[in-house]
Amino acid sequence: MTVSENAYAKSGVDVEAGYEVVSRIKKHVAKTERLGVLGALGGFGGSFDLSVLDVKEPVLISGTDGVGTKLMLAIRADKHDTIGIDCVAMCVNDIIAAGAEPLYFLDYIATGKNIPEKLEQVVAGVAEGCLQAGAALIGGETAEMPGMYDEDDYDLAGFAVGVAEKSQLIDGEKDVEAGDVLLGLASSGIHSNGYSLVRKVFADFDLNESLPELDQSLIDTLLTPTKIYVKELLPLIKQNKIKGIAHITGGGFHENLPRMFGNSLSAEIVEGSWDVLPIFKALEKYGSIKHEEMYEIFNMGIGMVIAVAPENAAALKKELNAFEIGQMVNRQEAPVVIKK
């Protein structure tokens, strides 16, 4: 070891552990390779050849996101193998809402101490998310930052790039109209938003125990990975069957639904038209959260909403195993109306 390496190690940065992380994650990255990827892991930049795609007028669409304080629960439970799926899901679900097929993904991990076994689990989850989305994991960065983070802490963010045929871009503001049917695709759980409130509600609970409302431990319920909707929606986008898409994340129904239609319309949602997952009932009960406010924070069991023409609604509902949760109407009051 050189003097400079020894000095760096004394400052808290373990270069050798960093090399080990790279060595460990290569097999996970390799599983995600797809047509268009150029080069191998370890270059200064990841490369992708767009010319191999059957797209006449390609439009690149990008998205970036993190996992929020759901990470704190993963760290507390020492369970790191699915949090990477969440990171990918938050990014690719956003770009599929614009009509994009995910092409590639990059991750960024910042930590107080490089622990190769743990970071391998995180990246394995990222790779699994990429597989579910059909995206290649073409690069990333792991930054060891002693003094910035405690040794056990880390943060995770991701960046997705996708492509859409210009004529198939989802433009709900232009295409969604009164009378269109709203179909809801079930969520897998809380997904990756609202966790600062979730942690507060369950701060004094034993996370390894269950609740009367749940069929598994509380921690397993809270760490259920975010569902990725790419493979369900992409074929329908290419068939021009979808007029608008809303990814129900932070801000719940009230913030995200209006992002897929114009100011002259309202989304009329019929409460009781889908199965609200037990974890949301538990949050409302134990957190003493107002029922109306739940729709302003959480997905309530619906992770993605699509607007479709009435004549296509029945077939698409069956194909997607979706719920018919409401319709678009001319605006007379708020942008989103929850009808009991």
UniProtKB/Swiss-Prot annotation:
Its EC number is 6.3.3.1. One of its GO terms (molecular function) is phosphoribosylformylglycinamidine cyclo-ligase activity. It catalyses: 2-formamido-N(1)-(5-O-phospho-beta-D-ribosyl)acetamidine + ATP = 5-amino-1-(5-phospho-beta-D-ribosyl)imidazole + ADP + phosphate + H(+). GO terms for cellular component: cytosol. It is an enzyme of class 6 (ligase). GO terms for biological process: 'de novo' IMP biosynthetic process; adenine biosynthetic process. CDD domains: PurM. It is found in: Cytoplasm. It holds the Pfam family AIRS_C. Transmembrane segments: none annotated. Pathway: Purine metabolism; IMP biosynthesis via de novo pathway; 5-amino-1-(5-phospho-D-ribosyl)imidazole from N(2)-formyl-N(1)-(5-phospho-D-ribosyl)glycinamide: step 2/2. The keyword Ligase applies. InterPro entries: PurM-like_C_dom, PurM-like_C_sf, PurM-like_N, PurM-like_N_sf, PurM_cligase. It comes from the Bacteria. Keywords: ATP-binding, Cytoplasm, Ligase, Nucleotide-binding, Purine biosynthesis. Belongs to the AIR synthase family. HAMAP family: AIRS (MF_00741). NCBIfam families: purM (TIGR00878). This is Phosphoribosylformylglycinamidine cyclo-ligase. It comes from Lactococcus lactis subsp. cremoris (strain MG1363). The gene is purM.
